[in-house]
Amino acid sequence: MKRRYFILPALLLMLFSACGDDENNYQIGGKKGEDTPVQPDDRQSEGPEIAKYNLEFPALKGGKSVVVVHYGVYNDRLNKSGYNYAVEWDSEIRAQRWSCYQMYEDNYKSGAQVTRYNAKNDGSLSPECQYPNDPDLPESYRLTADPYKGSGFDHGHICPSADRQRAVEANYQTFYITNMQPQNNKFNAGIWQDMENQVRKWANNFDTLYVCKGGTIDKSDWILRYLGSGNNKIPVPKYFFMAVLGKKGSNFKATGFWIAQDSYTATTLQSYAVTIQALQKNTGIDFFCNLPDDIENEVENIPLSQMEKEWTWFK
């Protein structure tokens, strides 16, 4: 049974000053002084503390999967640092299952825009290359060579670089190889980019946007092929998804995207819009599980036609 909590501004200050790194930065949305309901899911007990409270986290897979949480400076002008984003990495499949993150005033909207990280793409995975290894991932789980290089597939960002352009460090962290999935260029630079632009426009209409995105890696018929070999062999997902939860004041609403990167035809984003309930059935992932049950059931089970009316579509 899940227990319900309300994260209050005063409690947030206590958490920030008294807890360890994983417990520091519950960046809860909503207007100043307003409670945000949180009902931690028991399935989060083996993960980092932040996964028990932050609403963007789905239910953790467990087993041979680990959750890596990235912290750093997220706004250079305001000199603010804390939680950036998190990723679930399957050490057996050697691929990421999802990245999750938040978009709100200080980490997305305000402050000067920094230049996108750009370095030599030599496939070395060194800290100085374009797609470095994740320093927070246990060394035994890391790739030793970049399987994307020469494959014809793009390094497809899951937490986008463009969503983290208020600080050099936060932007650099989005280039970790753990935040990538293989995408063909037409998809990555086309409709996937359109979906990311759509999410960014939505972020301007909410106090906080909670986002979880990824590609399918858990079933053979969800995988197009593999890149690399040996310990550097990674799957190419057939399907990609986005789960988006918006909070404004005390109100929540949610939507999702589900798309096959090799066989999509429609160019309108609404063609790929799905309810969270449908997305959960498609992916096997339980999204927004830290919401209280009544709110979770309401936002996840809304009829598709009603969901489409509640969101503003820009393409």
PLM regions: where:
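Domain-level detector for secreted/extracellular nuclease and nuclease-toxin modules, and
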Residues: G20-K315
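Positively charged n-region of N-terminal signal peptides that target proteins for export
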Residues: M1-Y5
